[in-house]
Amino acid sequence: MNADGRTRLHQTPEWAALVKHREQLGEVRLREMFAADPGRGTGWTLRVGDLHVDYSKHLVTDETLALLQELAAATGVSGLRDAMFRGERINITEDRAVLHTALRAPRDAVIEVDGENVVPQVHAVLDKMAGFADRVRTGEWTGHTGRRIRNVVNIGIGGSDLGPAMAYEALRAFTDRSLTLRFVSNVDGADLHEAVRDLDPAETLFIIASKTFTTIETITNATSARSWLLAGLGGDEKAVAKHFVALSTNAEKVADFGIDTANMFEFWDWVGGRYSFDSAIGLSLMIAIGPDRFREMLDGFHLVDEHFRTAPAESNVPLLMGLLGVWYGSFLGAQSHAVLPYSHYLSKFTAYLQQLDMESNGKSVDREGKPVQWQTGPVVWGTPGTNGQHAYYQLIHQGTKLIPADFIGFARPVDELSEELKSQHDLLMANFFAQTQALAFGKTPDEVRAEGVPEELVPHKTFPGDHPTTTILARELTPSVLGQLVALYEHKVFVQGAIWNIDSFDQWGVELGKVLAKRVEPALTEGADVPGLDPSTGALVAAYRELRGRR
């Protein structure tokens, strides 16, 4: 029991009921469940916005879902959700509100933080972004030499990179193809080198994304980009203001860098980095797709926000997806979760979800600071189909691990493809549907034998099935649909964190390595003695210096 008198999660009757249910359920056979309920394939579906969600191929019964709903009620998921939407400080370790939902609220909404409606601030920044994006897109904004901007390079890291980079790839078919967009995040100098090596400085705009303007990787890359620009434009310091803008709140450091603070786009402490690409952090995306399509994306986010906030528990899609994740992770022993989009344009979607999910729920203490006695966030992984089918699907089909998976697909290819390329879409989606069937129902030894397979090969060609999947299907990938998908996963992650009683909105795990890196760097560059360096790391530092030719 916690100090406040609350029963800890694993000691609640609802948790105990699920443990008992898991024992009684035994081995779940999807073939048997579908045979017993012919309507399962059509009845176990939900819809939110443009997303058709099929959860029939999961290792759950009606009783499982009912018990999970009781767990959600007992752990106060809806209360914490409502507190988040109200602007309460639910990020307890940093004493901050969590209001990424305000970033896509309509102009007439009222959402208060400490008694102040933040929606007018949000729309003021969006309007400022739109004005700037239009000036770049039309050629009104020119560089130092008077030439129009044709290249945009976003420099950020974490949420300042993963979100806009993912969304740009997802919405390439909606971008202005006359503009080249690149994203730099790695402090490895090769990242910036490859991003700018074929660009003309006179036509290149850099967007520096750092709330504090002190993020070491971002400012290191920004400083190198500044040197590259000045070297290419004759060294005139005035050029910086025409080729750099900032996504930040630190006006002093932005000005010191040479950026005009009139071209600084702000965001707020109640926006976490991994939830931020629909804020000023998305400026590069807005330049690429235009303000109108950016707003369509925000409307897609808001649609799912409202669904999550108002839909009854039994038809609430993010709640359902979160509960299924808790079922597999906390009761069936699953350690990972695969997200498998059958769309080339979603090639960076799973990498984006890795930060969203693992940085949020990769925690081992609860909100009271006590070690958890239950499994929390899974390892999230995956790549677009059909590539994965020729790589790791073997392990999912016939390996020894339980790996729940989400399959995301679209009924229509993007319009700009040729008719011949559009015709390939049916083959792509045939694989999409075939894989979920194969994972669910497998292939029995008798079915293998019926094909005349030699007996010694029968075990090798048998597929056990009973691998759970969620299928998410939409008509086509549009800005609105992308917003809906991202919001769906945002709120799924929220649900799981609420049930596990962890703070899903801090990320202290990234801090220790940063601190140690600052201490280690002088040992690499100067050979300085670093107090507290363990023998293994000390030996590795010495080996590094020798390989670098430093004694």
UniProtKB/Swiss-Prot annotation:
Annotated keywords: Cytoplasm, Gluconeogenesis, Glycolysis, Isomerase
Gene Ontology biological process terms, A to Z: gluconeogenesis; glucose 6-phosphate metabolic process; glycolytic process
Residue positions of the active site: E359, H390, K514
CDD domains (alphabetical): SIS_PGI_1, SIS_PGI_2
Catalytic activity: alpha-D-glucose 6-phosphate = beta-D-fructose 6-phosphate
InterPro entries: G6P_Isomerase (IPR001672), G6P_Isomerase_C (IPR023096), Phosphoglucose_isomerase_CS (IPR018189), SIS_dom_sf (IPR046348), SIS_PGI_1 (IPR035476), SIS_PGI_2 (IPR035482)
PANTHER family noted in UniProt: GLUCOSE-6-PHOSPHATE ISOMERASE (PTHR11469:SF1)
Protein name listed in UniProt: Glucose-6-phosphate isomerase 2
Organism listed in the record: Streptomyces coelicolor (strain ATCC BAA-471 / A3(2) / M145)
Gene name of the record: pgi2
